Amino acid sequence: MPLLDSFAVDHTRMQAPAVRGAKTMNTPHGDAITVFDLRFCIPNKEVMPEKGIHTLEHLFAGFMRDHLNGNGVEIIDISPMGCRTGFYMSLIGTPDEQRVADAWKAAMADVLKVQDQNQIPELNVYQCGTYQMHSLSEAQDIARHILERDVRVNSNKELALPKEKLQELHI
């Protein structure tokens, strides 16, 4: 099985909260697609609660689009990581990490403005696979956690696992 990009970086050295440009590729028509690692938690030390990350998934997708789309950028998807330490965001365009960090902080401020669980988009049996597994208060705790800390940039070059380590891990 090929080594995926997300596993070629040293998770023991990742900072959080932090933005990392995980991958950039071009479509056959020449459009740039960029994937960002939006790391909310320090891997293997912190984790977002399942109800909070689920609610954040519903809110974050819209709020990030409000703050990042435009000027050559259009978000394709924002999805939570299975490890519950962050989200992956795929988009058309190549915004720099600071632009993404600024949009992320603005989106977290928007999460704090949501006053009632009924304001969570698509929170119903028809549009959500586990519509009862939500917590606005947990999502807002996550947002506060981001806003209370400085959003940094994680560098692929600094986090790259050396070839020797990959061989040691039998990859």
UniProtKB/Swiss-Prot annotation:
The keyword Lyase belongs to this UniProt entry's keyword annotation: yes
GO molecular function (one): iron ion binding
Swiss-Prot/TrEMBL cofactor(s): Fe cation
Top-level EC class: lyase
Keywords, in A-Z order: Autoinducer synthesis, Iron, Lyase, Metal-binding, Quorum sensing
Catalytically driven reaction(s): S-(5-deoxy-D-ribos-5-yl)-L-homocysteine = (S)-4,5-dihydroxypentane-2,3-dione + L-homocysteine
An annotated GO BP: quorum sensing
Cofactor binding mode and count: Binds 1 Fe cation per subunit.
Region forming the signal peptide: none
The EC number(s) this enzyme carries: 4.4.1.21
Binding residues for Fe cation: H54, H58, C128
Alphabetical list of PANTHER family matching this protein: S-RIBOSYLHOMOCYSTEINE LYASE
Quaternary structure annotation from Swiss-Prot or TrEMBL: Homodimer.
Biological role: Involved in the synthesis of autoinducer 2 (AI-2) which is secreted by bacteria and is used to communicate both the cell density and the metabolic potential of the environment. The regulation of gene expression in response to changes in cell density is called quorum sensing. Catalyzes the transformation of S-ribosylhomocysteine (RHC) to homocysteine (HC) and 4,5-dihydroxy-2,3-pentadione (DPD).
Name of this protein: S-ribosylhomocysteine lyase
Organism this protein belongs to: Salmonella typhi
Gene: luxS
